[in-house]
Amino acid sequence: MAAELEYESVLCVKPDVSVYRIPPRASNRGYRASDWKLDQPDWTGRLRITSKGKIAYIKLEDKVSGELFAQAPVEQYPGIAVETVTDSSRYFVIRIQDGTGRSAFIGIGFTDRGDAFDFNVSLQDHFKWVKQETEISKESQEMDNRPKLDLGFKEGQTIKLSIGNITAKKGGASKPRASGTGGLSLLPPPPGGKVTIPPPSSSVAISNHVTPPPIPKSNHGGNDSDILLDLDSPAPVSTSAPAPVSTSNDLWGDFSTASSSVPNQAPQPSNWVQF
């Protein structure tokens, strides 16, 4: 199922590549491009590197039609599928395979040195990615095979939590909360503070109010002759000065001041003889 989901991606395309038949290697010293007929390539065309899954494919195709000439599957790089020559950086030896499993070694070369560099780097990057994917898959398998930690609470297991400065003590009784009327608690005054009660505002109004003196009543009788004599007699003149009003804040001083402010009228003799 995983192989069906894999898609083919293109890693590198070079429009000009030459193919050479190479002689068998006589020793393990490596291949040399100088042993090839570099001026007479056996085939020229286009090179394309693709990848499907972890395998890279070097495909030699026709420049015009795109027909496949040869294909070299690469499972590891550097490896036996792709080798560099010992005397040049522009030539390589690849192992091509057909559908029946037969294989052969041929030489390829690039005219431009930059094309050879891109060919080499494309293969290196692909297999570097393959190595990283392999390590990640191994780590995930190791994590799955490890015994899982049981972080749940066992039956009857408890823990103790400390929140800020509040710590729970074993066997300690909680302090009762004082509740006011209606379930509302009053906050205590701040430490070191003094509560000052302002004087009532009504005291200023009472101290500034002056009670008027009462009107004195007449000492004469109610007969007609007395009324006539009172009309003829001159009005009495008071010589006493009223007492000063106290502006003290004492509430009872206003009442004593009002009583003392009443003038004392002395009876004066009348010039008419009363009958």
UniProtKB/Swiss-Prot annotation:
Residues 256-275 have a biased composition (Polar residues). The modification Phosphothreonine is found at residue 211. Changing residue 272 to A/F/Y: Loss of binding to AP-2. Keywords: Cell membrane, Cytoplasmic vesicle, Endocytosis, Membrane, Phosphoprotein, Protein transport, Repeat, Transport. Changing residue 275 to A/F/Y: Loss of binding to AP-2. Expressed primarily in brain (at protein level). A motif (WXXF motif 2) lies at residues 272-275. Residues 233-248 have a biased composition (Low complexity). A motif (WXXF motif 1) lies at residues 252-255. GO terms for cellular component: clathrin vesicle coat; clathrin-coated pit; plasma membrane; presynapse. Changing residue 274 to A/M/N/S/T: No effect on binding to AP-2. GO terms for biological process: endocytosis; presynaptic endocytosis; protein transport. Belongs to the NECAP family. Interacts with AP1G1 and AP2A1 components of the adapter protein complexes AP-1 and AP-2. Interacts with the GAE domain proteins GGA1, GGA2 and GGA3. The WXXF motifs mediate binding of accessory proteins to the ear-domain of AP-1, GGAs and AP-2 through hydrophobic interactions. Selective binding to the GAE domains of AP-1 or to the alpha-ear domain of AP-2 is tuned by the acidic context surrounding the motif and the properties of the second residue of the motif itself. The WXXF motif 1, which is preceded by an acidic residue and has a glycine in second position mediates specific interaction with AP-1. The WXXF motif 2, which is followed by the C-terminal carboxyl group negative charge, allows specific interaction with AP-2. Involved in endocytosis. This is Adaptin ear-binding coat-associated protein 1. It comes from Mus musculus. The lineage of its organism: Eukaryota, Metazoa, Chordata, Craniata, Vertebrata.
